[in-house]
């Protein structure tokens, strides 16, 4: 029997070596025949803690690793572009101090 491979989005990585992956699927309502979006969350093992929130990943079914964890991270399909390091205001202030050679208090001169 082949192992299930599921593609989804990482919504949490707060636990050590564990990620929460959310998948969406469309199902047709039996009575109203309207498509309804269903969401399912899976816990997966991330050995190297390499996933960030927003990454698109593939997880593979494995033996039960804990009470709720039965999948293992197979690969990261696409990294979240927002997980890149963003320039913080502190680093901008330091660059301004270096550029103008003095104290920067955040006020503008006219």
Curated annotation (Swiss-Prot):
Pfam families: Ribosomal_S17. GO terms for cellular component: cytosolic small ribosomal subunit. The keyword Amino-acid biosynthesis does not apply. The lineage of its organism: Bacteria, Thermotogati, Thermotogota, Thermotogae, Petrotogales. Transmembrane segments: none annotated. One of the primary rRNA binding proteins, it binds specifically to the 5'-end of 16S ribosomal RNA. This is Small ribosomal subunit protein uS17. Part of the 30S ribosomal subunit. InterPro entries: NA-bd_OB-fold, Ribosomal_uS17, Ribosomal_uS17_bact/chlr. Belongs to the universal ribosomal protein uS17 family. One of its GO terms (biological process) is translation. It comes from Petrotoga mobilis (strain DSM 10674 / SJ95). GO terms for molecular function: rRNA binding; structural constituent of ribosome. Disulfide bonds: none annotated. Keywords: Ribonucleoprotein, Ribosomal protein, RNA-binding, rRNA-binding.
């Amino acid at each position: 029997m082949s192992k299930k491979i599921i593609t989804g989005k990482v919504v949490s990585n707060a636990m050590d070596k564990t990620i929460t992956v959310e998948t969406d699927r469309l199902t047709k309502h039996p009575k109203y025949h309207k498509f309804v979006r269903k969401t399912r969350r899976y816990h997966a093992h991330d050995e190297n803690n390499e996933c960030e929130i927003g990454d698109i990943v593939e997880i593979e079914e494995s033996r039960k690793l804990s009470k709720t964890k039965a999948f293992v991270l197979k690969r990261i399909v696409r990294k979240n572009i927002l997980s890149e390091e963003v320039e913080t205001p502190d680093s901008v202030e330091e660059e301004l101090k270096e550029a103008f050679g003095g104290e920067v208090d955040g006020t503008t001169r006219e």
